[in-house]
Amino acid sequence: MTALRLLVSDSHDPLFNLAVEECIFRQMDPNQRVLFLWRNANTVVIGRAQNPWKECNTRRMEEDGVTLARRSSGGGAVFHDLSNSCFIFMAGKPGYDKSISTAIALDALKLLGVSAFASGRNDLLVATQDGDRKVSGSAYRETHDRGFHHGTLLLDADLSRLANYLNPDPKKLAAKGISSVRSRVANLCELLPGIEHQQVSHALIEAFFAHYGARVSPEHISPTQLPDLPGFADTFARQRSWEWNFGHAPAFTHQLDERFDWGGVELHFDVEKGVIGRAQIFSDSLDPAPLDALAQRLVGVAYRSDAIAALFGQLKADFPARQAELDALAGWLQAALR
C-alpha cells in the first residue's frame, strides 16, 4: 500500500461528496496521507453543531434551489458553487498535523503566484489595499487515530449570493447553537484573472506531492465510479436525510408574529432535534379555540413547513366555520418556516 492517496470527485452533488468524504475518512488506512478534491453545485454547508434556521436564509435557499448540507466537522456556514474549489487533507496520527496541511495549501497558493498567510481563525488571508481578506476557510475533525483538514478556495464566487444565503431572515432566534463569524472575503480571480478550478487543483496536487516527496495516480470518483467503500449506501442515505441536515440542529426557540384582519397571532416554538417540543400561541382573536387546538397538535411535529401544513386539514374539518382564517394562517406559516 502506498503512503499517499489522491482522490478526485467528478460529481458536483454536495451530499454525494460529503458521503464519500465520510466513508474515506472512516475507512482510510491510518498510515496513509490522503488528498481529496471536488466542487459542489449551489450549496450552503453548515458545521456539525450549527442551527440551519439561525445560520441560513432557508426560505431564499428553497426558492433558488440551493442545497443545505451538514458536514461532520465543526466550523461555520459557507456557500459553495462551482466557483469554489474544495480540498481535504486526511492523515493518521501521530502524523496528522493541521499546520502541515495549512502549509501545503499555502504552498499551492504560492505556486499560483499568491502570497497568503494563515489567520488565528483557521482562514487563509491575503493582504490587499482594502485590508486583509479571506480566500480560504477551513474546518477540522479528529478521532483517536486520525484527523482531517477541510478547506475551500474562492475562485470567482458571486459574493452577493453568499451574503444572501448566509444572512438569516430578520426573525429572532434565541439559539443554543454557534453563530458563524462573518469574514471579509475575496475571490482569487481578483488576484489572478481567469483562474480556473483545474489550475487550483493542479497546484494543490503538486504541493501535496512535493511535501511528501512522492507521487501517485489520481482515483476519480463519481456516482457510477466509486472506490471500494463498504457501507457507502447507508452513509449516503444519512447524508441526504432531513434528520441529519436539519434535525441535528441544537435546541432553539423561534418566535413568529403576524396580524390578520381577524386578529394578531404570536407563536413561540421550542425545538429540539428538529422536532417541536412545546408550542404556545397568543392571539386577540375573538375565537381562540382553533389556535389552542393547533398549539396542542404542533407538539411532536417536525419543524418543517410541510409537516406543519399537514395539520390544517383536520383543523379545518374540526372548525369548518374558520376555514378562511385557518387557510390564511397556514399560508403564512408555510412561508415563514421555509
Curated annotation (Swiss-Prot):
Top EC category: ligase
Cellular-component GO terms for this entry: cytosol
InterPro entries xrefs: aa-tRNA-synth_II/BPL/LPL (IPR045864), BPL_LPL_catalytic (IPR004143), Lipoate_ligase_A (IPR023741), Lipoate_protein_ligase_C (IPR019491), LipoylTrfase_LipoateP_Ligase (IPR004562)
Example GO biological process: protein modification process
Alphabetical UniProt keywords: ATP-binding, Cytoplasm, Ligase, Nucleotide-binding
Gene Ontology molecular function terms on file: ATP binding; lipoate-protein ligase activity; lipoyltransferase activity
Domain BPL/LPL catalytic: 29-216
Enzyme Commission code(s) on record: 6.3.1.20
Subcellular location: Cytoplasm
Pathway: Protein modification; protein lipoylation via exogenous pathway; protein N(6)-(lipoyl)lysine from lipoate: step 1/2; Protein modification; protein lipoylation via exogenous pathway; protein N(6)-(lipoyl)lysine from lipoate: step 2/2
Protein's UniProt keywords contain Disulfide bond: no
Binding of ATP, residues: 71, 76-79, 134
Reactions listed under catalytic activity: L-lysyl-[lipoyl-carrier protein] + (R)-lipoate + ATP = N(6)-[(R)-lipoyl]-L-lysyl-[lipoyl-carrier protein] + AMP + diphosphate + H(+)
Gene3D superfamilies associated with the record: Bira Bifunctional Protein, Domain 2, CO dehydrogenase flavoprotein, C-terminal domain
Classification via Pfam families: Lip_prot_lig_C (PF10437), LplA-B_cat (PF21948)
Binding site for (R)-lipoate: 134
Assembly information from the UniProt record: Monomer.
UniProt record similarity statement: Belongs to the LplA family.
Role this protein plays: Catalyzes both the ATP-dependent activation of exogenously supplied lipoate to lipoyl-AMP and the transfer of the activated lipoyl onto the lipoyl domains of lipoate-dependent enzymes.
Miscellaneous comment in the UniProt entry for this protein: In the transfer reaction, the free carboxyl group of lipoic acid is attached via an amide linkage to the epsilon-amino group of a specific lysine residue of lipoyl domains of lipoate-dependent enzymes.
Protein name, per record: Lipoate-protein ligase A
